[in-house]
């Protein structure tokens, strides 16, 4: 949406200031900034400035007065190992093994099947990031401001299979172990997630020092952090429990983002958050 035809070169340095719970400076999805390689600290349109650098609220054209971003939604998912289905398969074979041991029927075959499933589940991983945001910005030459709402989440799921479990199941399968102790199996499934939600108001002011114009912006905001730490043995795995109260912790607080930017010339912009 910027009308300049030249290529904007950017120098970016970032740090989280007044952080209640540190989060990456690019903890949002916005098509233009993503297409530019995440250089939004120095190149954002004023309408998304609160997401990247509140100082950029002053970087508007003379005919700009209002901008509404409603909403910006994005997601990235990496699951090459099909973790969810494989975790379900492990759980299904565990239940069959559990039943076989209790009934003393088909134990060796059930142990062999469970070992195979655990081998497939070994060291697999899935990751995902999801974000949604909305911004309403008012452009003016005195004190541009904006209302910002943003939520960003990241999830990681993986399995940890112990070699001792594979050896134990192998011995059960070949008949070396006949008195089976189900508690001897300790392989685990892990699910971790964090969701950070911000609600804030951004302000910016253009200043001048020794003839060099620059802008300072601030976004005081309320922040909620939801943490999930799902850590269970494969025998207790249930994907519906991932967001249960037992594994969920919430924190609330207030913090602020502070940013600055200046145009060194027509081709160079420096941004700092």
Which positions does each model-derived feature cover?
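Subset of outer-membrane beta-barrel
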Residues: 25-273
């Amino acid at each position: 949406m910027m009308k300049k035809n030249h290529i904007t070169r950017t120098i970016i340095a970032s740090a989280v200031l007044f952080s209640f719970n540190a989060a990456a400076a690019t903890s949002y999805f916005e098509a233009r900034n993503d297409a530019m390689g995440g250089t939004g600290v120095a190149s954002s349109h004023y309408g998304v400035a609160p997401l990247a650098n509140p100082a950029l609220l002053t970087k508007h054209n003379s005919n700009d007065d209002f901008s509404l971003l409603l909403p910006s939604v994005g997601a990235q998912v990496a699951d090459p190992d099909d973790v969810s289905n494989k975790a379900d398969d492990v759980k299904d074979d565990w239940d069959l093994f559990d039943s076989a041991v209790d009934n003393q029927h088909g134990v060796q075959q059930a142990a062999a099947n469970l070992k195979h499933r655990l081998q497939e589940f070994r060291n697999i991983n899935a990751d995902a990031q999801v974000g949604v945001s909305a911004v309403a910005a008012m452009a003016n030459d005195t004190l541009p401001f904006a209302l910002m709402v943003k939520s960003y989440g990241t999830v990681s799921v993986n399995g940890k299979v112990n070699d001792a479990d594979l050896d134990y199941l192998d011995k059960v399968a070949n008949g070396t172990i006949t008195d089976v102790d189900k508690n001897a199996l300790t392989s685990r499934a892990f699910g971790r997630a964090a969701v950070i939600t911000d609600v804030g108001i951004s302000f910016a002011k253009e200043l001048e020092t020794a003839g060099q114009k620059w802008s300072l912006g601030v976004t005081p905001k309320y922040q909620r952090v939801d943490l999930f730490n799902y850590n269970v043995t494969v025998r207790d795995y249930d994907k519906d429990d991932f967001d249960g109260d037992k594994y969920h912790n919430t924190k609330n607080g207030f913090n602020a983002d502070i940013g600055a930017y200046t145009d060194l010339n027509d081709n160079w912009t420096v941004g700092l958050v």
